[in-house]
């Protein structure tokens, strides 16, 4: 995630803004509708990044364990390939010693296919995307990304396409989810990160976060982090239709002190507002899509025990994780380095109870939309927090260093791949 001096981009014309507003990104809880066929069960997939597994949990209630799948069945083959290539080895070790905090990153993001037959996984350290058969545990297809690291993904509303950020190549690939064939790609800012399809699948929003592994973390050195921007691409032609430079918007809002590296983000149900976190900040901002300006800011409490040394904050993330209730009334925030999560009222921006959590690194919405589920990467568990009360419901142990949590589907009665 690297940065150069930020580009200033001309404001979008009104017609384009209106078009994008009308086709704005879907709420975080939206998932592709399963294809007709064998009975499916909705579940939560939890990617255990340092372990290379995904735990599969009930999507509601007690988040009971359903099964587990190994998402690196080809580990030995991939390692041989890496160790025989000095350039690949250099990046592999670089990931381990920076973003990986001394560990390899084996699973970043996951989505299931519409028929519930496979889970598609981006694997940072292996610089690829794979489809793993849920019945056999074998790899159906593999797509090596450009460059040397794969990152966040997004699935199209119909479930047929998956987008993945190739973070060292400043590229987003869009793949056929069934075959792994590339349908197209587009260029981004430095270190592309989050991806979001619009509700009709027409546009794809990507945010780039720049270099979050350098130690040049003082506010006055923020410009060294690279070219950070939102790139909106046509998901059919893969041409860029809009670029949003948040540096200019933050300056206009009176917050030149804040980083313009956009981290997790959520759109309101009517898709008129974007809520986003930025590097080094304990809080989030509200952006009006039609008027192209930042309208509100929420600063959340600091944990007195959190170090003030910004170089100790993992990948520049003070707070990293956000989801919105399906009705748009509440935001769930993961306060990563401050070791809590909280539910915020969207109308008033008042936060609820601060729920203690150990390095929470993601937030998603459960299957019935009544709770958010956070990954506690420091404690190897996931925790459900009630949207209505802001109180913790349940915690469930998972594997080593859970990060991304996604809703998906598996065949009814599935408890894991068949042995052998």
Q: Where do the protein language model's features map onto the residues?
A:
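Secretory targeting and sorting signals
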Residues: 2-30
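Short amphipathic alpha-helical segments with coiled-coil-like heptad repeat character
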Residues: 1-4, 62-64
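Predominantly soluble domains enriched in secretory-pathway, periplasmic, or organellar proteins
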Residues: 28-420
């Amino acid at each position: 995630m690297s940065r150069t001096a930020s580009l200033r981009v001309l404001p979008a014309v009104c017609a384009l803004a209106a078009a994008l507003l009308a086709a704005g990104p879907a709420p975080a809880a939206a998932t592709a509708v399963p294809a007709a066929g064998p009975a499916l069960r909705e579940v939560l997939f939890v990617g255990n990044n340092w372990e290379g597994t995904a735990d599969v949990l009930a999507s509601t209630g007690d988040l009971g364990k359903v099964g587990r799948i190994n998402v690196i069945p080809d580990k030995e083959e991939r390692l041989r390939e890496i160790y025989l290539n000095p350039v690949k080895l250099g990046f592999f070790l670089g990931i381990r010693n920076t973003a990986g905090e001394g560990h390899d990153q084996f699973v970043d993001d996951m989505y299931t296919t519409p028929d519930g037959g496979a889970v598609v996984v981006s694997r940072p350290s292996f610089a690829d995307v794979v489809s793993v058969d849920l019945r056999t545990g074998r790899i159906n297809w593999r797509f090596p990304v450009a460059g040397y690291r794969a990152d966040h993904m997004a699935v199209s509303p119909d479930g047929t396409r998956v987008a993945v950020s190739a973070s060292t190549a400043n590229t987003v690939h869009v793949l056929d989810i069934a075959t792994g064939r590339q349908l197209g790609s587009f260029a981004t800012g430095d270190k592309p990160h989050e991806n979001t399809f619009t509700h009709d699948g027409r546009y794809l929003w990507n945010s780039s976060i720049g270099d979050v592994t350098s130690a040049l973390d003082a506010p006055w050195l923020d410009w060294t982090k690279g070219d950070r921007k939102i790139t909106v691409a046509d998901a059919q032609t893969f041409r860029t239709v809009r670029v949003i430079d948040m540096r200019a918007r933050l300056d206009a809002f009176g917050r030149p002190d804040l980083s313009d590296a956009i981290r997790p983000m959520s759109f309101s149900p009517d898709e008129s507002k974007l809520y986003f976190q930025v590097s080094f900040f304990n809080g989030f901002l509200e952006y009006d899509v039609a008027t192209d300006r930042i309208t509100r800011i929420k600063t959340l409490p600091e944990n007195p025990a959190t170090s003030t040394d910004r170089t100790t904050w993992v990948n520049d993330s003070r707070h990293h994780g956000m989801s919105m209730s399906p009705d748009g009334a509440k935001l769930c925030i993961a306060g990563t380095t401050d070791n809590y999560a909280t539910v915020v009222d969207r109308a008033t921006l008042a936060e609820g109870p601060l729920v203690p959590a150990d390095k929470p690194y993601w937030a998603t919405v459960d299957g019935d939309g009544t709770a958010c589920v956070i990954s506690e990467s420091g404690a190897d568990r996931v925790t459900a927090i009630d949207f209505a009360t802001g109180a913790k419901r349940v915690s469930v142990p998972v594997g080593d260093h859970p990060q991304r949590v996604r809703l998906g589907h598996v065949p009814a009665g599935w408890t894991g791949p068949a042995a052998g």
